[in-house]
């Protein structure tokens, strides 16, 4: 017979075994419940999604579901007041809207053709497929223009959002540049001519009408590279805004916001697809008309104009200019009724531009931007070596020294010998190839040398030797630049004297120069005549 202790131990073992069985049953029950829930979820009918269109009577709404327009009921938890057209909804098996979900961020990107009066949009889905779509709620108040790209859902026939395409927006800079005429040195005559051609007609419109004068439709700035053509165009836009603010009695900030400087980058506008470049030109002028219609000044600036509007029939691989040039002509002629639009073109190969563009009534005013002579060069140097730059010697004497070194006519400064087809030849010096960009680069080089010198020795300021070294380096780096392979083209782009009147047969680079100009203290002031190549 078992003792009391043995029976107690056996009971404890049975109790522990019972606890383990209970825990196992509980675990099995939980797994069974989970499996049952999974089985029920697998067996549930699938939910679907629809696009919200509009609210109807009561709690019903119209949605677009798989291409069909349905009127469905809504769950009590769905906030109908927060729904806007284009919102994405989840529908249950009974096709009742139960939840709003994040909208789709994918679809087709298409250009806007026209914004209709009733807030609908005409878009070009394909070259031969134009459709009318409705705006989603997020676009109800946004102003869209022809040429803007939008994301659309063709199934729901909705425009979802506006898309900014970098390759298109980069072609046109609409912000008016902050460049004033007093920041441009050595181009006083050209600045006066363009102000008479552009600012006067805009500011004195009534007086022009009294005399029966028509403002010029365009201005061509031509000349060698780096001589300030682009800066003049930017300054024109800036000055027009300032004068417009004075005449209209509005703030400069308001005038800047409403005016536009459409800077068209010629080479980037070219597109291999037929008609795309022409479409881009149309969009540029549409933006101009839109701004000008509100009586605000608009400048359309075509840089590197010969890249786009070359003389028709001169193309080697393709004649894209046969359609691009007529498109520009049609747009310029169409701008004749707008007093606030001016077209400015810049080119260093004006001989390649189609003559139809240059005739009176289109680009009426032609202004040649010449290379700076000695006086102009010194003025430009003074803009960059101004009072804010620390110097070791007298600033005016430093400017005189730099101008004399750059415009030296001694044999040591000979750059190239140009041989003409008539047997003649000219020896040209570095001064004949100086541009505003060259002068700025020389001053920047001198400043860098001064910085390095200050770090090494502690001496502060630009010295005469820094300028000499900068001039020498600038000229040495350009010794190999003349093109002997295509002398005629190089001569035209460089703006050589006599270019266009005599054929250039050869360009022969000469030896570099050695600066031997005496120090500041021992040198008298030089003359002020300079090359105007």
UniProtKB/Swiss-Prot annotation:
Coiled coil: 1-42
Example of a GO cellular component annotation carried by this entry: proteasome complex
GO MF annotation, one: ATP hydrolysis activity
GO biological process, any: proteasomal protein catabolic process
PROSITE patterns assigned to the protein according to its UniProt record, in alphabetical order: AAA (PS00674)
InterPro entries referenced in this protein's UniProt entry, alphabetically: AAA+_ATPase, AAA_ATPase_domain, ATPase_AAA_core, ATPase_AAA_CS, NA-bd_OB-fold, P-loop_NTPase, Prot_ATP_ID_OB_2nd, Prot_ATP_ID_OB_N
Pfam families recorded: AAA (PF00004), Prot_ATP_ID_OB_C (PF16450), Prot_ATP_ID_OB_N (PF17758)
SUBUNIT field: Homohexamer. Assembles into a hexameric ring structure.
Annotated protein name in UniProt: AAA ATPase forming ring-shaped complexes
Organism: Brachybacterium faecium (strain ATCC 43885 / DSM 4810 / JCM 11609 / LMG 19847 / NBRC 14762 / NCIMB 9860 / 6-10)
The gene coding this protein: arc
């Amino acid at each position: 017979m078992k003792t009391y202790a043995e029976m107690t131990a056996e009971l404890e073992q049975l109790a522990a075994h019972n606890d383990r069985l209970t825990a196992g049953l509980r675990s099995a029950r939980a797994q069974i419940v989970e499996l049952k829930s999974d089985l029920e979820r697998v067996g549930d009918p699938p939910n679907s999604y629809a696009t919200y269109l509009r609210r109807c009577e009561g709690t019903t709404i119209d949605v677009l579901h798989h291409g069909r327009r349905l009127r469905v009921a809504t769950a009590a938890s769905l906030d109908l007041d927060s729904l806007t057209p284009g919102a994405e909804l989840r529908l249950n098996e009974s096709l009742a809207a139960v939840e709003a979900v994040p909208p789709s961020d994918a679809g087709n990107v298409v250009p806007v053709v026209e914004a209709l009066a009733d807030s609908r949009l005409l878009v070009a889905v394909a070259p031969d497929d134009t459709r009318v779509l409705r705006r989603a709620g997020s676009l109800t108040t946004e102003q869209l223009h022809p040429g803007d790209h939008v994301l659309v859902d063709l199934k729901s026939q909705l425009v979802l959002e506006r898309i900014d395409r970098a390759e298109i927006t980069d072609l046109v800079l609409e912000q008016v540049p902050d460049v004033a005429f007093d920041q441009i040195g050595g181009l006083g005559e050209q600045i006066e001519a363009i102000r008479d051609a552009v600012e006067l007609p805009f500011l004195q419109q009534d007086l022009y009408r009294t005399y029966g004068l028509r403002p010029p439709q365009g201005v061509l700035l031509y000349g060698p590279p780096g001589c300030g053509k682009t800066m003049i165009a930017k300054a024109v836009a800036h000055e027009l805004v300032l004068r417009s603010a004075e005449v209209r009695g509005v703030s400069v900030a308001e005038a800047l916001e409403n005016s536009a400087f459409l800077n068209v980058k010629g080479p980037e506008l070219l597109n291999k697809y037929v008609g795309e470049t022409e479409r881009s030109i149309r969009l540029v002028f549409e933006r101009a008309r839109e701004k000008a219609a509100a009586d605000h000044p608009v400048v359309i600036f075509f840089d590197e104009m010969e890249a786009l509007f070359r003389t028709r029939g001169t193309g080697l691989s393709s004649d894209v200019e046969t359609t691009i040039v007529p498109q520009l002509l049609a747009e310029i002629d169409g701008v004749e009724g707008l007093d606030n639009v001016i077209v400015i073109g810049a080119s260093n190969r004006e001989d390649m531009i189609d003559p139809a563009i240059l005739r009176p009534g289109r680009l009426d005013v032609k202004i040649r931007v010449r290379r700076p002579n000695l006086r102009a060069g010194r003025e430009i140097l003074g803009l960059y070596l101004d009072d804010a730059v620390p110097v070791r010697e007298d600033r005016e004497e430093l400017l005189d020294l730099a101008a004399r070194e750059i415009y030296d006519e001694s044999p040591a400064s000979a750059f190239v010998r140009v041989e003409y087809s008539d047997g003649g030849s000219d020896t040209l010096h570095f001064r004949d190839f100086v541009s505003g960009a060259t002068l700025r680069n020389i001053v920047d080089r001198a400043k860098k040398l001064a910085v390095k010198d200050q770090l090494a020795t502690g001496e502060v300021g630009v010295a005469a030797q820094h300028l000499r070294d900068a001039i020498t380096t600038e000229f040495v780096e350009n010794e190999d630049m003349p093109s002997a392979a295509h002398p005629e083209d190089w001569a035209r782009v460089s703006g050589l004297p006599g270019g266009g009147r005599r054929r250039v047969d050869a360009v022969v680079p000469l030896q570099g120069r050695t600066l031997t100009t005496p120090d500041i203290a021992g040198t008298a002031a030089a003359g002020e005549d300079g090359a105007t190549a």
